[in-house]
A protein has these predicted regions:
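Bacterial N-terminal signal peptides that target proteins for export
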Residues: 1-9
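Bacterial N-terminal signal peptides
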Residues: 8-20
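Sec-dependent signal peptide cleavage junction
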Residues: 18-31
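Structural signature of tandem-repeat unit edges
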Residues: 38-46, 56-73, 82-95, 103-125, ...
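A short, well-ordered alpha-helical element
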Residues: 77-78, 159
Length: 269
């Protein structure tokens, strides 16, 4: 019994240690997770902080621009309370390479200060100033349809991740790129209009859109990355563009209802 108890204690201590260490750069570098109030973060060489976790149960949160004297410049895919409905980004965050709020099922509004140097919001939806890309659509918004504003250049990585209320999304002629996982797991999405301005559809852009039954891809699209329509189990009809030369791996993987696909003569591999 004593040996078993000692083993359990050692295991518990090891678990505590591991939960306070993260790995960066492909697992080659250890970073200690630091705690400041309701937030956990790691430090970078320049002294800036990367926010990892929010421990608060509050429904509305204003994220800090400083933690223990360190400027918060990066927000990772943070673990929030499932009750989060509104979040405000600090002015210190200069960029987001993907939507960090995909795990917030009740989130309805994302806010930034009017003078924020890098982002702006329209009706609670987050956009990047430098290129007018749509960065994050709150997955708790109850609207069934959404028209992306004219002037938007791209739908960013995971921008509509897990937005289960949306049945229809229309994209303006200004959009040129649909990024990786842009509409991933939009389980109610039935219709999406892709304008002839789009030239690239990213990896897994529409994967697990299980209600999507048909898709027409315009001739402007020259690249569709792997798995873009994987797990679209209701998809029955696809029209591929004449500009396409290659069908990427797993493009229609597990599309169990697919019965009609038009492959143009331009496709050689």
């Amino acid at each position: 019994r004593k040996r078993f108890s000692a083993f359990l204690l050692a295991s518990a201590l090891l678990l505590v240690f591991l939960t306070n260490v993260v790995f960066a750069d492909g697992g080659k570098k250890k970073q200690t997770i630091l705690t400041s109030g309701d937030y956990q973060y790691v430090l970078h060489k320049d002294g800036s902080a990367e926010l990892l976790y929010c421990l608060s149960d509050d429904a509305e949160i204003v994220l800090p621009d400083m933690l223990d004297g360190h400027r918060v410049t990066i927000i990772d895919t943070i673990s929030f309370s499932l009750s989060l409905t509104a979040v405000t980004l600090p002015n210190s965050v200069a960029d987001l390479d993907h939507n960090p709020f995909g795990c917030c099922p009740l989130l309805q509004t994302i806010s930034v200060a009017p003078e924020h140097p890098s982002f702006y919001t329209l009706d609670g939806v987050l956009f990047r100033k430098k290129d007018d890309a749509l960065v994050a659509y709150p997955r708790g918004k109850a609207a069934s349809s959404y028209a992306v504003p004219q002037g938007t250049s791209a739908v960013g990585e995971r921008a509509f991740d897990c937005c289960s209320f949306l049945t229809s999304v229309s994209l303006p002629a200004s959009v040129t790129e649909i990024d990786d996982y842009a509409f991933s797991d939009c389980s109610a999405l039935v219709e999406v209009s892709i304008p002839s301005s789009v030239d690239e559809i990213g990896s897994c852009a529409f994967n697990y859109c299980t209600a999507l039954s048909s898709i027409v891809i315009p001739d402007s699209v020259t690249e569709i990355e792997e798995g873009a329509f994987s797990e679209c189990r209701a998809l029955t009809t696809v029209v591929l563009p004449n500009s396409l030369t290659e069908i990427s791996d797993y493009l229609f993987s597990c599309c169990t209802s697919l019965s009609d696909i038009l492959i143009p003569a331009s496709v050689t591999e």
